[in-house]
Amino acid sequence: MNYLTTTNYCFPCQTHLYHGKVRDVYTVGSDMLVIIATDRISAFDVVLSRGIPYKGQVLNQIAAKFLDSTSDILPNWKLAEPDPMVTIGLLCEPFKVEMVIRGYLTGSAWRKYKEGERTLCAVTLPEGMKENEKFPNPIITPTTKAYKGHDENISKEEIIERFLVSKEDYEQLEYYTRALFQRGTEIASSKGLILVDTKYEFGKKDGRIYLIDEIHTPDSSRYFYSEDYQERFEKGEGQKQLSKEFVRQWLMKQNFQGKEGQIVPEMTPEYCQIVSERYIELYETIVGEQFIRASTSNISARIKKNIETYLMNKEQVKWNNMV
């Protein structure tokens, strides 16, 4: 099955191209971003060699729907979706931190807790907690934003002391983070899911804070099924979840955790297909709609055409308004 792992277009008025872990980001003019959600998959801050069919479409369309459903909380960068794998929006100056919020003790937080750590980003964790247990209140554990390599945990105090974010702006980011997580929790609950943890990225434009990048996708979030959560928790069983964690678990079974000297294992085509179906399952569960699979015939040409058509139409509207 076809998938798209990289692009290298040259659009009119394009000024910059950046290849992220899973997204290709084009700057057009001085105030517009064209972001293509590719089918690349990363774990432990390493991009794996094979792409996952439909993953980019799943991420892009989930993020777009959640951007629309949270726009009353704060403005966001999105302007249009000219293609199932593309969002075009405002260019904002990103804050140099990512806001991670956790409702449950799981994933990397649990691994550190199990090793005896009781503070995370200067947040004190209760004693006696078990894996996948709900925190009394969601905790915010920010990370530095690494364009290459590993993101690093950082405390609120360090962020302010290092002038990464002003105290006033950081407190606003905390407020938005909790409000977005509450909204995401409510939407997930209505679909029989638990929003376990997630991350948000913010930026500034003309003095206003905007929500940027993806939101509540399986790459940025972790979901449990709520139906049998309590039973599994009481039995000490692993939770059935919809997230990238199952890919991380697979990698760890292959003795890979992104550490220096470790060899990245290659996923088989069969396993890639399993991962693809898990992503589609999450889309249909959290969105509550059937996933319409876009054609995988010449994906790159389709995307290029759709973006160029949007940019041309936007330029025509701009020209007409000037006349």
UniProtKB/Swiss-Prot annotation:
Keywords: ATP-binding, Ligase, Nucleotide-binding, Purine biosynthesis. GO terms for molecular function: ATP binding; phosphoribosylaminoimidazolesuccinocarboxamide synthase activity. It is an enzyme of class 6 (ligase). InterPro entries: SAICAR_synt/ADE2_N (IPR028923), SAICAR_synthetase_CS (IPR018236). Pathway: Purine metabolism; IMP biosynthesis via de novo pathway; 5-amino-1-(5-phospho-D-ribosyl)imidazole-4-carboxamide from 5-amino-1-(5-phospho-D-ribosyl)imidazole-4-carboxylate: step 1/2. Its EC number is 6.3.2.6. It catalyses: 5-amino-1-(5-phospho-D-ribosyl)imidazole-4-carboxylate + L-aspartate + ATP = (2S)-2-[5-amino-1-(5-phospho-beta-D-ribosyl)imidazole-4-carboxamido]succinate + ADP + phosphate + 2 H(+). GO terms for cellular component: cytoplasm. GO terms for biological process: 'de novo' IMP biosynthetic process. Coiled coil: none annotated. PANTHER family: PHOSPHORIBOSYLAMINOIMIDAZOLE-SUCCINOCARBOXAMIDE SYNTHASE (PTHR43700:SF1). Belongs to the SAICAR synthetase family. This is Phosphoribosylaminoimidazole-succinocarboxamide synthase. The gene is purC.
